[in-house]
């Protein structure tokens, strides 16, 4: 169940290196909705940023998720459920010459999971501001619980290290490199999820037992990106990302995008992303027997699968408002369409001979609506 805390884990990457410039004073109101695979997640978010003395900046964010899940994992081994997650974040930035220091803290809480994270990032402009180097680390400590079992309580400790480099190669071309390493230790599997194994004594031909994961995991990701600005204020961008971990997963991501301004008030965006990964060493859709090996997983996100995403978006800068304290404002809408196809995860709800059921796949939609104001 806790996997719903991350709507789009495939899209996550190390933060890009950024110039040592404080963000503008602004407020953003967001509504986001995800629908796909029997899961619906939606909720609002509010983010406010404010500068002080041109050297300091603070930010605060609140986000609320409403989750309704009847995913294939849930309907085959449990019951559909609904829950709410609340996330609070606080951050501060300090600018000292060409160096920016950023400290952030995030708390997320739901009925069976509490997550806390603190991070420090440093960004430095070099070589006449044409190059930016950034590095940082984050520490997370989570508590995993299980609804219906008050005695169940496990922990997860996580360390994240990241490095970023961006460079202006020429007046129209920006390039970047990001590298990230994450180490996890603790209870890393889902307490609700089960694996299935061949059971001749069962009418279905198989039975279930709880998943068992290793209690450690180290993953690393490297990404190369580039953005080229066209003469008519448009831009094209591309990124390649490689991911690998100690569980045997290797993944590749390719993203291409185009941004096009229209007039003085409109900006349109088009994005395509392709993702492909191999399965974890201890994953199987159907194990030959109970306790077939030390570690057991049937989470489809640890299987071999491919996804495609096509996204479109538009931003409209609003005319001046009657409120003098708002310098400018805009409205943005983004829509992403995902397709997931699994190579070794089968849809057991379709019936059939165990291990020969149809392969699973589903479509998902993500909607995002922003209202932003600068003051």
Where are these regions (language model features)?
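Outer-membrane beta-barrel "beta-signal"
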Residues: 122, 172, 312-316, 362-375
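Extracellular loop and loop/strand-boundary signature of outer-membrane beta-barrel proteins
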Residues: 31-34, 74-79, 104-108, 119-121, ...
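Transmembrane beta-strands of outer-membrane beta-barrel proteins
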Residues: 25-29, 58-60, 101-103, 131-135, ...
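Transmembrane beta-strands of outer-membrane beta-barrel pores
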Residues: 31-35, 64-68, 96-98, 107-111, ...
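Short loop/turn motifs that connect adjacent beta-strands in outer-membrane beta-barrel proteins
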Residues: 18-24, 55, 98, 127-131, ...
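Outer-membrane beta-barrel translocator/channel fold
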Residues: 61-91, 130-189, 193-194, 218, ...
